[in-house]
Amino acid sequence: MVEPQEGKTRFHDFKLSNELMHAIHDLGFPYCTPIQAQVLGYTLRGQDAIGRAQTGTGKTAAFLISIISQLQQTPPPKERYMGEPRALIIAPTRELVVQIAKDAAALTKYTGLNVMSFVGGMDFDKQLKALEARHCDILVATPGRLLDFNQRGEVHLDMVEVMVLDEADRMLDMGFIPQVRQIIRQTPPKSERQTLLFSATFTDDVMNLAKQWTTNPAIVEIEPENVASETVEQHVYAVAGSDKYKLLYNLVTQNKWERVMVFANRKDEVRRIEEKLVRDGINAAQLSGDVPQHKRIRTLESFREGRITVLVATDVAGRGIHIDGISHVINFTLPEDPDDYVHRIGRTGRAGTSGVSISFAGEDDSYQLPAIEALLGRKIKCEMPPDELLKPVPRKHH
């Protein structure tokens, strides 16, 4: 039993089913994060909602708990075919879909609800077999792959009771909206389904889509600043470009860090850093658009399980990664878009734990700092790294 605590909402307060509470308890979530407390207050009553929240705020569990409650309370239709999901979650990237499906599997553990996911770059026939084997309650998919199945007549969306659009701003940026429209047209009219839309930003374009697809939605905004700055201790080291690798190597080895993410701006840079780390005896792996999907998923699993210490990634590849216990984020190069800085450092300090970010500012990228500080609304102290962190990397005897 979770004790009441002032200023905090317990999951217990929402009258969720025993099966769902059991799973939430297994995951070790005693209290709701702010977005969970606010969103669930509306969505559990069946209301539509638009949430502005970045990753790391707990929004995935918010919409999943809402979906599971809804599906548990309404019996499935009598006439039901394979390939007719009752809840549909659309997300822009493969990583995000895999992550949401994993969270959904954990939360539905005791409910008997089936979760399926479709992503491009994975074996089509294997996904099809899974679909034909049992009823699908919750379907998580990227827009393109969902349309493939839909156009082949394998998936029908006429039974969708709840629809979630995650990272709507990102879907806009990636040009997925025409596909999303095609998908939504095949679901029941908005008056007959519950629709939840999440976005890191509320631009006019996002709000227009929300207006078209939702009915009298509750609008929930969780300020992004505290995601970045309150739980993450931020440092900047002024360091010459040629010394950045030495600094990275020494930070990881001298501190014996166990789970670190390193961000760089370009794929070739990511590859180079990873190759050097591996050569110097560190368990490292890379994630970028060049890495085939099956390998990306294996890499993420190894990182989650601690077999990989350092994961080097580009912004696009790193954006959908939600792995608890990342102690440090290193910006090997400062990002060109200040928003990416917030997303990067948000990989650590997740769900209320503290984390550390260290940015390397060199002659090529330190000019990005003022824009990042403007977005954060404060200065980040720039320090010179201590000498022991710039020691030459010992050459391994091959």
Curated annotation (Swiss-Prot):
Gene3D superfamilies membership: P-loop containing nucleotide triphosphate hydrolases (3.40.50.300)
Localisation: Cytoplasm
InterPro entries membership: DEAD/DEAH_box_helicase_dom (IPR011545), DEAD_box_RNA_helicase (IPR050079), Helicase_ATP-bd (IPR014001), Helicase_C-like (IPR001650), P-loop_NTPase (IPR027417), RNA-helicase_DEAD-box_CS (IPR000629), RNA_helicase_ATP-dep_RhlB (IPR023554), RNA_helicase_DEAD_Q_motif (IPR014014)
EC number: 3.6.4.13
Keywords: ATP-binding, Cytoplasm, Helicase, Hydrolase, Nucleotide-binding, RNA-binding
Predominant place of localization: cytoplasm
GO CC annotations, alphabetized: cytosol
Gene Ontology molecular function: ATP binding; ATP hydrolysis activity; RNA binding; RNA helicase activity
PROSITE patterns given in the database record: DEAD_ATP_HELICASE, HELICASE_ATP_BIND_1, HELICASE_CTER, Q_MOTIF
Motif DEAD box location, chain numbering: 166-169
Sequence ranges assigned to domain Helicase ATP-binding in this UniProt record: 40-220
Motif range (Q motif): 9-37
Biological processes per GO annotation: RNA catabolic process
Catalytic class of the enzyme: hydrolase
Binding-site positions, ATP: 53-60
Domain Helicase C-terminal: 243-393
Catalytic activity: ATP + H2O = ADP + phosphate + H(+)
Purpose: DEAD-box RNA helicase involved in RNA degradation. Has RNA-dependent ATPase activity and unwinds double-stranded RNA.
Family: Belongs to the DEAD box helicase family. RhlB subfamily.
Entries under NCBIfam families matching the protein: PRK01297.1
Assembly mode: Component of the RNA degradosome, which is a multiprotein complex involved in RNA processing and mRNA degradation.
Protein name: ATP-dependent RNA helicase RhlB
Organism, as annotated: Pseudomonas putida (strain ATCC 47054 / DSM 6125 / CFBP 8728 / NCIMB 11950 / KT2440)
Gene name as annotated: rhlB
